[in-house]
Amino acid sequence: MTKRVHVVAAVIRNAAQEILLALRPSDKHMGGLWEFPGGKCEAGESPQQALARELQEELGIVIHSCQPLIQVHHDYPDVHVLLDVYEVLDFNGHAYGAEGQQVRWVAQDALADYQFPAANRTIVRAAQLPQRYVITPEHLSVEQLYAGCQQALENGCQLLQLRAPQLTALEYSDLAQRLETLCAGRAQLMLKGDAALLDTFA
């Protein structure tokens, strides 16, 4: 029977919006890889309690506020991991490697330069998404949608999800191509629709 492990992890940002990473010791499972700080839940602990304990033990910080970011299920050859990931909103203390591990503040755009355990890769993508993004409303015409997206980008939108079930496949495809050009270098475009259609943008 596959072993199951419940783990918590934290995305912690400093004032410069850099994200804290910790290097797994070489003598541990998946040693030498970078990870988001955290650890295993102990019996009777809630994920938030485990997170608070682990961050105090590992980093010497006390968290005051956090919110769920993502939950990840991942199967390794020898273990199934359930990973509850939280974004830490407020904490006290100066984060350091309290257990002797190397820690580093990393720019969000530089996360791709680091090697992570497979279960952490989904966290990397979630951490890089803007905290707020625009989802297009239904029941608008193509030109209304385009104008609204244009306005959202001018207002600083960094992630735009094109959700338009009212459009035909051809209308959606044409609009997506126009928005892809509009968003280039300014924002991420997320498409939501028929899988066969989305494959054309892969």
Residue locations for each model-derived region?
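NUDIX/MutT-family hydrolases
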Residues: 85-89, 95-128
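Conserved N-terminal beta1-alpha1 strand-loop-helix module at the mouth
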Residues: 90, 95, 125-202
